[in-house]
């Protein structure tokens, strides 16, 4: 019962063609923009501009893009330096479209929106603090902007104990 058997087998490939598959997916969100995208998708109380909004108006100043895209956000230009622009928050007290300010001594009594750039405050709204010129950023470097007009809508991470005139969060590419 100890017999062995030798056998040769000829194997030929039997290839089956499958139909083409098309895979579509959104590009992964960069870690830097994750919280922006989470709040934007959730509709978390703010108004949002994406990179596509800025790409469509790359020839404009950042202030002009904001002025035309975020109704209710007041943009003020410095009368002495008209290329500079600042976001005025909900309790705006400045008439007209320009400010008369002493050279960079800081914010006068009107209520300017606080500004966060890539997660760090660059203007917090303290008296005498230098304002942040939103035109210092070209639209081509902006990945997204969030604007919150009232303290109740500001994300907890950025809502300190100070009174607020709104918050603008700017994300760069």
Predicted segments with their positions:
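Short, acidic, small-residue-rich periplasmic hinge/interaction motif at the N-terminus
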Residues: 2-55
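Soluble periplasmic/extracytoplasmic beta-strand elements of cell-envelope proteins
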Residues: 6-10, 20-24, 48-49, 65, ...
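Short, glycine-/polar-rich solvent-exposed loops and beta-turns at beta-strand/coil boundaries
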Residues: 1-3, 75-87, 138, 158-164
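A beta-strand signature from Gram-negative outer-membrane beta-barrel systems
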Residues: 9, 137-173
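Amphipathic, non-transmembrane alpha-helical segments in extracytoplasmic/periplasmic proteins
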Residues: 59-70
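Short beta-strands and strand-coil junctions in structured, solvent-facing domains, enriched
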Residues: 16, 29-31, 56, 72-76, ...
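Periplasmic plug
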Residues: 86-151
């Amino acid at each position: 019962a100890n017999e062995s058997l030798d056998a040769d087998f000829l194997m030929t490939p039997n290839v089956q063609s499958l139909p083409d598959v098309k895979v579509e997916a959104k590009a992964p969100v960069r870690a830097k923009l994750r919280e922006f995208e989470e709040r934007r998708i959730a509709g978390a109380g703010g108004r949002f501009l994406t990179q596509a909004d800025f790409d469509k108006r790359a020839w404009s100043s950042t202030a002009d893009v904001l002025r035309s895209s975020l109704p209710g956000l007041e943009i003020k230009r410095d009368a002495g330096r008209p290329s500079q622009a600042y976001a005025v928050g909900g309790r705006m007290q400045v008439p007209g479209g320009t400010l008369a300010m002493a050279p960079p001594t800081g914010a006068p009594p009107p209520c300017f929106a606080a500004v966060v750039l890539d997660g760090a405050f660059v203007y917090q709204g303290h008296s005498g603090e230098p304002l942040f010129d939103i035109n210092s950023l070209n639209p081509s470097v902006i990945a997204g902007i969030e604007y919150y007009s009232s303290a109740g809508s500001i994300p907890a991470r950025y809502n300190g104990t100070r009174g607020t005139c709104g918050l603008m969060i700017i994300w760069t590419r």
